[in-house]
UniProtKB/Swiss-Prot annotation:
PANTHER family: GREB1-LIKE PROTEIN, GREB1-RELATED. Residues 263-278, 296-307, 1119-1161 have a biased composition (Polar residues). It comes from Homo sapiens (Human). InterPro entries: GREB1, GREB1-like_2nd, GREB1-like_C, GREB1-like_cpSF2, GREB1_N, TAGT. Keywords: Deafness, Developmental protein, Disease variant, Membrane, Non-syndromic deafness, Transmembrane, Transmembrane helix. Plays a major role in early metanephros and genital development. Coiled coil: none annotated. It holds the Pfam family cpSF2-GREB1. Widely expressed, with prominent expression in the cochlea. Expressed at high levels in fetal kidney. In adult tissues, highest levels in vagina, cervix and epididymis. It is linked to Renal hypodysplasia/aplasia 3: A severe, autosomal dominant disease encompassing a spectrum of kidney development defects. Clinical manifestations are highly variable and include bilateral or unilateral renal agenesis, renal aplasia, hypoplasia, (cystic) dysplasia, severe obstructive uropathy, and vesicoureteral reflux. Bilateral renal agenesis is almost invariably fatal in utero or in the perinatal period. Unilateral renal agenesis can lead to future health issues including end-stage renal disease. Residues 87-96 have a biased composition (Acidic residues). Residues 252-262, 1195-1206 have a biased composition (Low complexity). This is GREB1-like protein.
Amino acid sequence: MGNSYAGQLKSARFEEALHNSIEASLRCSSVVPRPIFSQLYLDPDQHPFSSADVKPKVEDLDKDLVNRYTQNGSLDFSNNLTVNEMEDDEDDEEMSDSNSPPIPYSQKPAPEGSCTTDGFCQAGKDLRLVSLCMEQIDIPAGFLLVGAKSPNLPEHILVCAVDKRFLPDDHGKNALLGFSGNCIGCGERGFRYFTEFSNHINLKLTTQPKKQKHLKYYLVRSSQGVLSKGPLICWKECRSRQSSASCHSIKPSSSVSSTVTPENGTTNGYKSGFTQTDAANGNSSHGGKGSASSSTPAHTGNYSLSPRPSYASGDQATMFISGPPKKRHRGWYPGSPLPQPGLVVPVPTVRPLSRTEPLLSAPVPQTPLTGILQPRPIPAGETVIVPENLLSNSGVRPVILIGYGTLPYFYGNVGDIVVSPLLVNCYKIPQLENKDLEKLGLTGSQFLSVENMILLTIQYLVRLGPDQVPLREEFEQIMLKAMQEFTLRERALQIGAQCVPVSPGQLPWLARLIASVSQDLVHVVVTQNSLAEGISETLRTLSEMRHYQRLPDYVVVICASKIRGNEFCVVVLGQHQSRALAESMLTTSEFLKEISYELITGKVSFLASHFKTTSLGDDLDKLLEKMQQRRGDSVVTPFDGDLNECVSPQEAAAMIPTQNLDLDNETFHIYQPQLTVARKLLSQVCAIADSGSQSLDLGHFSKVDFIIIVPRSEVLVQQTLQRIRQSGVLVDLGLEENGTAHQRAEKYVVRLDNEIQTKFEVFMRRVKQNPYTLFVLVHDNSHVELTSVISGSLSHSEPSHGLADRVINCREVLEAFNLLVLQVSSFPYTLQTQQSRISSSNEVHWIQLDTGEDVGCEEKLYFGLSEYSKSLQWGITSPLLRCDETFEKMVNTLLERYPRLHSMVVRCYLLIQQYSEALMALTTMASLRDHSTPETLSIMDDLISSPGKNKSGRGHMLIIRVPSVQLAMLAKERLQEVRDKLGLQYRFEIILGNPATELSVATHFVARLKSWRGNEPEEWIPRTYQDLDGLPCIVILTGKDPLGETFPRSLKYCDLRLIDSSYLTRTALEQEVGLACCYVSKEVIRGPTVALDLSGKEQERAAVSENDSDELLIDLERPQSNSSAVTGTSGSIMENGVSSSSTADKSQKQSLTPSFQSPATSLGLDEGVSASSAGAGAGETLKQECDSLGPQMASSTTSKPSSSSSGPRTLPWPGQPIRGCRGPQAALPPVVILSKAAYSLLGSQKSGKLPSSSSLLPHADVAWVSSLRPLLNKDMSSEEQSLYYRQWTLARQHHADYSNQLDPASGTRNFHPRRLLLTGPPQVGKTGSYLQFLRILFRMLIRLLEVDVYDEEEINTDHNESSEVSQSEGEPWPDIESFSKMPFDVSVHDPKYSLMSLVYTEKLAGVKQEVIKESKVEEPRKRETVSIMLTKYAAYNTFHHCEQCRQYMDFTSASQMSDSTLHAFTFSSSMLGEEVQLYFIIPKSKESHFVFSKQGKHLESMRLPLVSDKNLNAVKSPIFTPSSGRHEHGLLNLFHAMEGISHLHLLVVKEYEMPLYRKYWPNHIMLVLPGMFNNAGVGAARFLIKELSYHNLELERNRLEELGIKRQCVWPFIVMMDDSCVLWNIHSVQEPSSQPMEVGVSSKNVSLKTVLQHIEATPKIVHYAILGIQKWSSKLTSQSLKAPFSRCHVHDFILLNTDLTQNVQYDFNRYFCEDADFNLRTNSSGLLICRFNNFSLMKKHVQVGGQRDFIIKPKIMVSESLAPILPLQYICAPDSEHTLLAAPAQFLLEKFLQHASYKLFPKAIHNFRSPVLAIDCYLNIGPEVAICYISSRPHSSNVNCEGVFFSGLLLYLCDSFVGADLKKFKFLKGATLCVICQDRSSLRQTIVRLELEDEWQFRLRDEFQTANSSDDKPLYFLTGRHV
């Protein structure tokens, strides 16, 4: 409230109200008392102030109170810079900054005579946007137009010009303090204060003028040049801009500093925990007049905790750096880490939470302090002077944990204290929705009082062990449980009863009582006035204490003020705790810089000199020199000998192992889990393609290409290259040739360094230039360095900062339609925030590795983090996860002596000494044994003794993890020096594992590695850690993070003792232990006690005899029962070329190494195992891998149908004794030695619970959304963990995903649709999985480019008519003379007729009846298909898209759909006996094919060409394609098949399907059948096409005749083609060469255009009725092509002469066999049918639509679950009560006849000498029966049936041509008759007319009908017997 208004109140009245309010808030626990300002100002009976009231009575007020206390515990001031921005405009104007009453802000009166109208400046010029929107406004360079809001004109925006340096950038950063603006109206320039400017433009504010509050929008010009409101000015983001209060440390990133740099704004994963609500008061302003300056000390950063839980305060408050005291010093950057000496350093202050309003009120985001405020006097009692030499005297740098209330200001030696916001957010009440509160078991009303918070904090501190450090996540759960208990208690109490709160009087003694059990480790200091008193007292006591005096670990300072309520903070004094807390505030980058600084500036010199002597006090260097001299020139024997045996260096260098271990590194395998995950990835890609978002069109691509981006690690690059080469993926994807793939692999792996930009641009060029290639960008280890480009450019950080963001999130990547992004990570938590760019549905998680179940024949199981934690319960004497207690004690002693050094420096120096002395103790100075920790000693003993035990020279690897590069280099130099002086340089190698450099290994060790490998070229050097398998070595692994490198099976020890309290995030900690994760023998997990409990002696004895080895192998290879075993889809032993027998032989020949050898990560299932050996024999294996995707592809376009895959096979898991190098001993996990801090988090696992590392903040780049959140459940799968993190974590400002904020319009976040995330534990095999994914993705794309076509041999070839006349081979066209003399072959040869009735020929009569096999017709026969590659001449369905046929397929604009016009076309049909009205839908672009009436409205005809036309770019015949149920799958895109030439294509569709076809084929002409044919079969479509075409031919003849063209010159042919015709081929017979061999057939794919143009060029074509081509089969022989033309049936694709066939009709009733029926009619009319045998048609197997059967159901459904209806139920007796069916009568009849031959024609079964006589029809009456087709028409040509006795007579809807002359045919005795008619009366008339009763006997019960209701017009039939 400031002093501005103080004088307006009577002090007595103020104090009374104030005390009442405080008292009420203390007494009250449920009812919220009214805020005191409401009592004072808003009482209804309050009189207006009299002038007497408004007297300055400041002296009567408690100054401290006035300065510090307001209603919200916030501060108010009249004349400062800072912001207290409210979200709402209205709130802005209704509340002052302190939420005091809206007393108008006192502005200077406007100059006399000036304009004061709202919306105009004082010069009277209009500033409103509506007036200026069309004006051209000139503004100076560097200025922007912005919009200001005036409270008096809410609907208007005022236009201003502001210097953009004073505005924030897009990320809310970098706005200079102050203001510079110009008036757009009158042109006045140079306003330097916003207050002054706001007066000039008449804002008339009721509150303090602030640019942040009143400058609202950027103004932008639209494309029309109109100035309009643009985006909001991003002031909000300023909140995160400030840095913390700086301590006066000497350098930027001192570990002692409480500074949090602007780059990170983090305290090791914790956002500093308070939010700015208000800034410091300005000068006291007496009587309302503000003084402009002050000389008092600067009070530059007083900020307080908002009691209203604001959105920001959940986790985002930040600490600030104090700056110079001048108000408008523009040159000073707020993040400056070097404040001027002698200034006060403000420490974040936390205001008390008053009980004046509900704790969970609406959030009020408030903007933090962005600059320097006016200085103001600092009240006494508010300051703490830090004593000089505090750290030096006490050896402790105290850490002050911000608690609850206002922290004081610190003066003096502030570098010796640290202020930590670690727990501050735990004391805030976050804003949560009710549903979230309910999930947590809380209500909105019951939260903890401050008193309870204080007691809980003390309780927590007491409970912490002496080695434990307060952990924010742990304390949050304690607070949550306490709140849940309160809620439960509240619910349990009766309504009206109250929980008794802790009273202020009780608090001190309760606090002391709780602390009393802590054995003096927790002290409580209670003060009355302020926290400053308690802190001062604590620091003073500390500075006066002597080192030997015992300090408490924690001092809890409580200020029990009657005025302000209770406040508290915690001063951490524990040596270990204070250091750990201070160090944990630094990010990894910061503490590495800190260490670097300490090393560079020589701060470590004291420590270094300490370690110059051994533990016994000897000078280390001199001692080593002495040992070296004693040894002379000789060195310890490299292997196969004791440590005491020495040889000359030359001899040592020449020693090569006698044994070739044949590591067989190049053999590569894919294992079932990897295959499963690869398929999961593939199915997710398919899901994206099918999602309807149209973000991925897989049909578009024919190739797969990729690039793998890895972090900056040379070894990782080489490792990935090795995987790519071994997997053979480049050859499999067709990207490289076999010979060059090895060299060319390098262009596919790029690391994130400064060169990535150029390499990536090359890649993106490839992406743009190859639109038909699907590119996959794999971002491996994608959690590493995921910082944003912007934060990288602003901070002086690592060179890799923001590189990943620049690549992965650049616009080109997001927009490229042919680019998939696959992010791969073992620790994906940083990618799973609320701002994640990856949809949770696009995450693919590694399959659950459940070790509890029997996994059958899998010999290796994954041993990961949770297995390490669980192993602690196994009770083995040598646990796998260890903490070196002795080492920790030594460290603690040293840390006390060197308080100013970072603990990692101290730890590292000690570790170097430990290893050095262990080496000396084991070789020359046994007296040092007692001074090395047993852990270190045993590791070194194992390391240097194991090579001596065998002739192979194999040994173990030890990893020492040293994150700081400088420390790592120091360690390497020091250890190398000790090793060399001890003569061990040939015994083991020391390697620096620096990500930035390649591996460097001594020549003699390289020679040893080469001899083991056996087949390496001369220049080979190890490039990956796996190449070092078996080499005894120490790898000093350095770098900020481990980057996913895989370690060899010989890794035995992983020393993580340097990984301490700086690693308090889940990712940081788990990725370190991830180094040791690997696959182990399953015995390790099944029977760990036996497998792992081997003492040293037992290890030596464990070398197994040959017999043992034999038995073990047999056991290993035996498949387990009840297994979830791996099936040998692609990685089985046999497929990989390693049989179990050869394995056994091989491994028995090897000598066996000691049994405790960890495989770590072996070749098999380590990162990136791939599909099979890359050698020549791999081809078959690779083809097998996609068994789930259909048959494999052969080398040509076709291949044989694939057989089913083989059964389960045993898989060789890595480390199984296949390679023979390790013998059959168990593969064991490495031993991990941890620091105490890491061990307490990873080793504290209760049974079955997640390691408690999982409860930590997941990553330093993210923040918790709220301190109230459920615990990460132990049973959560990785999918559930992902959802948890997506709900409860946010990306920090420097995170690459931070910019992916909510879309204000839709309220959703933008996921990148083509981005996937693959997550799996470290070293589980993810690389192999994604390489396999690339392979099967390519296989699938090829599969999409393949088509399944029918591949069936012709049927009935043994009884076709011999051609008496044949043409010579090689003739392109038939000769009409000789062709007409050929007999017609009435047998149907199309394989689809294989289950239909044979057509009788004289030759058939001689066929033995046994030849025809009986087939179960109930079971639909699976037709043979084969996969072939689509070619450029294929017909396509809607799933094909390409640039060429886009116009053909789609409309160019949305309006074009309506451009199609609907035309009715009517003609009369004699067959139907009525007029038929069809509809044409004609797109505008196709209207040229039609003739319209003069008015252009009426469709007259479809244009036809002339017979004589010769146009190479057109086909003459219109193409008609009847289609039903295949709007998506029908092959109706003929663009490529017709080579893009103009053609007339008409889709013939049913009326009800027209909208669907029109939607999918908008550019096609549709011919819509009348509604009466909606249920008709394909016969109706063919009938109407032919009728329409003939009618059109007549119309065209008439039209062209008028133009003088003869009628016979008009082209009479149409093409009738099925919607499944996909490819066309031309065949020729190859001439046999000189040696006798079978004549071959050569085939070539040709276009439909070629076929049609060739057939249309047939001489005298108008004399042929039908022309067609044969069906393709892979079994086409030269024999079948011998005759180039056949006179026989043609199907599916025909050229039909509508003129000649005018009187031959398709049967429009038919569903089946309509084409054979029509062919027989045509032939019997004496017309020519010609088949071109040198062309063939491929038909696609389309699984939907077409002539699919109706699902026959009862017309009235009685119940849903009815038994299937059998074919014999399709008919019934007339007028019976039979179940009536809902299906067309004709359909029921045809289906019935197919199955009823036994009943209808018993004499005809298998009796082909006596066929059934069918008059004028061919119907399928079953394959057991032959039909003799006879036409009743006069002069028709029929088969010779003299002497044939028929077994039956079929009369189907016979017309008047059928007469009584049927009596001339002879029938067997007992032959049967079936007469079918439309109705009962015509049935009777037919029997009478044909005099059937003379020869046939009928019974009344032999009359039937189809089982339709009478409405559906059933068909009737009568059966009879020949007499």
